[in-house]
Amino acid sequence: MSSESNPETQIKLFGRWSYDDLRIENAALKNVISLKPVYLPHTGGRHEHKKFGKLEIPIVERLVNRLMGQAMNSGSRKDHVNSKNQGKKLKAMRTVKYAFEIIELRTGKNPIQVFLDAIENSIIREEVTRIMYGGVSYFHAVDTSPSRMVDLAIRHIAQGAAMKAFRSPRSLAEALAEEIIAAAEYDRNRSFAIRRKEEIERIALSSR
C-alpha cells in the first residue's frame, strides 16, 4: 500500500504535522519554498555547494538554520558574530518544535500552514539599493527577487522572536510562536516582521 493511501505511513514533520493540503497563495513564492515532506528538518548541508541549492531545503529547516545564527539581542547587524547558538541545530530544532506545538494549541491549525502564512505576509516586495553616479551615491527603489523575499521574511521573523525573548521570562519557543502567529494575522502591533516590511517598503516608495 502506498504512503499516500495509508495515513500511518505518511511522512509528518516531527511525526506530528502533515504536509497535506498546504497552500501558498503568492505565485511568486511557489518555486522558492520547498514543501518536501521530511520527518526532521535536517538535510546535512547537501545543497551547500549548489547554486540556488537553498531553494531545495525544506522551508522549516531554513527557519531552524536562521535561529542558529540569530543573536539573542536587539537584532543587530552582527547577529552571526554575537550568536551563541552556532552549530546547535538540535537546540534550534527543539525550539521550532515547541513553538509549533504552541501555535497548534493557540490557533487549532497546522503550524506549518501558519508559518507559510506568516512568510507570505512578511515578504518585502520592494527595497532600496545604492547606485553611484559620478562619485555621488543615490538610493534607488528596486524589486526584490522571490528568493530574497523569503530570506528576509525568515530573517525578520527570527529577529522578532529573539527581541521578544531577550531579557524576558518567556522562552525563545514562546516568542517564536507569538511572532509567527502575529505575522500570520498581519498584526503590525505585535509582529516585528510586519513592521520591518512596512518600513522598508515605505523607504523604497519615497526613493522612486
UniProtKB/Swiss-Prot annotation:
InterPro entries: Ribosomal_uS7, Ribosomal_uS7_arc, Ribosomal_uS7_dom, Ribosomal_uS7_dom_sf, Ribosomal_uS7_euk/arc. One of its GO terms (biological process) is translation. Keywords: Ribonucleoprotein, Ribosomal protein, RNA-binding, rRNA-binding. Gene3D superfamilies: Ribosomal protein S7 domain. GO terms for cellular component: cytosolic small ribosomal subunit; ribosome. It comes from the Archaea. One of its GO terms (molecular function) is mRNA binding. Part of the 30S ribosomal subunit. One of the primary rRNA binding proteins, it binds directly to 16S rRNA where it nucleates assembly of the head domain of the 30S subunit. Is located at the subunit interface close to the decoding center. PANTHER family: RIBOSOMAL PROTEIN S7 (PTHR11205). NCBIfam families: PRK04027.1, uS7_euk_arch. Belongs to the universal ribosomal protein uS7 family. This is Small ribosomal subunit protein uS7.
